[in-house]
Amino acid sequence: MDDSSFMDLMIDTDEYLIDDWESDFPICGETNTNPGSESGSGTGFELLAERPTKQMKTNNNMNSTSSSPSSSSSSGSRTSQVISFGSPDTKTNPVETSLNFSNQVSMDQKVGSKRKDCVNNGGRREPHLLKEHVLAERKRRQKLNERLIALSALLPGLKKTDKATVLEDAIKHLKQLQERVKKLEEERVVTKKMDQSIILVKRSQVYLDDDSSSYSSTCSAASPLSSSSDEVSIFKQTMPMIEARVSDRDLLIRVHCEKNKGCMIKILSSLEKFRLEVVNSFTLPFGNSTLVITILTKMDNKFSRPVEEVVKNIRVALAE
């Protein structure tokens, strides 16, 4: 009795499953005329092909465990689980999904290609701009080479003409010149303090023109005198050498002449002709045959003759 009731229950369950499959998939025995639903029909056939096999497995399990009432209850629960899989509400269209995916991929490819085109176009230069850039760079290099050639021509003892050597030697040469200029400036400051504006009147020469005579003298600036032998020889060649210096109404006269008798008297007599008041005078021997005569005089308010004329008269007096 138990076995017969169990078999009847299995038959009823199988009929219920087949009815549900037919209601869920009415197109199993028909050919589909809608091209858009081919994938849907194929899915239905796959489900029909899979579920009988599962049912056969459950039937085998049921036959093997038909001796116990617990096996019937477990098979019933399995049958209910199989029924719950066939939900008619969850229908998908894989064709539409594949079309949407292919459209999305094509759109992404188009956007990517447009971005690449924009980047490539932005990175490129116009042909005429590129040509102008090349010409400007060429001119710049040409000017740079010309400047380097001119600089290398100014550098003494240049061994190599490459850019690095030229620049290095130029820097060294400039540093040497700066040091030299600094030394010369220091020497100039020192000598400027010692220098004095001195009028040197050399030997007078007489130029005869008809019955009149004129005296010409050469004036130059000189540094303070030294006691070296070279200076002494120069003094002997240019003697008598007369220096005159004016400060306000004072006139300082210094005469370098050979040691002769009556030199001081001749000089003082020539100064009296110009009505110059002698304030102080002294004589110093310089070497064996040279005298240094220094005379300080004061000019009155009526004195208007130039100092050069006084010097010429002193020279003429010493030459007599």
From Swiss-Prot:
Keyword Hydrolase appears in the UniProt entry: no
SMART domains hit by this protein: HLH
Pfam families the record matches: HLH
Key words of the record: Activator, DNA-binding, Nucleus, Transcription, Transcription regulation
Main location: nucleus
Compartments in which it is found: Nucleus
bHLH domain segment(s): 128-177
Ranges of biased composition (kind: Low complexity): 58-80
GO-annotated cellular components: nucleus
GO terms under biological process: endoplasmic reticulum organization; regulation of DNA-templated transcription
Molecular function GO terms recorded: DNA binding; DNA-binding transcription factor activity; protein dimerization activity
SUPFAM superfamilies: HLH, helix-loop-helix DNA-binding domain (SSF47459)
Name of the protein this chain belongs to: Transcription factor NAI1
UniProt organism field: Arabidopsis thaliana (Mouse-ear cress)
